[in-house]
């Protein structure tokens, strides 16, 4: 039960500064612009201190049409923990998500709560970042053109299992897209945008690891000495390749789903890097 001095309300733009305070307290790299993008694509709640109008907790739900949603930006102020705020925020946002299948990336600290709410482990997500070393430019990737967007949407839908057109159109506006072609059509794509301390590459979708590396290399080759982040599934086995190019492993999270949806072992496309831990 929420203490009488704290209330939940819809997450609105006027709460962004308070949310930024919480993410900085948690040691997250998000800028105000990163929070704004998350809110533009999402809906959610804040826990507010009734007397001081202080944001004490946040949660967002990013819907991908009516089938899937990610739960993200779950933060509770250090001074307000132990009161059940995390549980109340999660209950509110899962109700908001309705019948959608839910996905999230958990910290070890949040894992017990998510398990109690019916989420199950679905893998490990590894955060790589650092200053890019010299990377040779690939020969088979090119900048995306406006006519490529429909093919990109289909590639992502096949790899992710949901329609993320709003996210991808936003990435096309605020960042850059690159694609791979085989002469008959698109076979992979990657996105890059400003985020946190520098830039993030993702999503990266391809048919095999070599193509995934080529798409990553396309953006990394132009960014020697600059700070770049990549979030990838541990199962992608890109860790050593990224570390050799300056992006070292610094953290990891636990991918969780409710309900668990098994990925086909013969699926033609793989997501080699996430758009972010918030967006999947």
Task: Give, region by region, the residue ranges found by the protein language model.
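Conserved N-terminal entry element of GNAT/NAT acetyltransferase domains
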Residues: 1-13, 131-146
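Central beta-strand plus flanking loop segment that forms part of the substrate or channel wall
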Residues: 126-130, 256
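Conserved active-site tyrosine of GNAT-family acetyltransferases
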Residues: 114-119, 242
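Active-site-proximal cofactor/substrate-binding loop regions of enzyme domains
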Residues: 5-99, 106
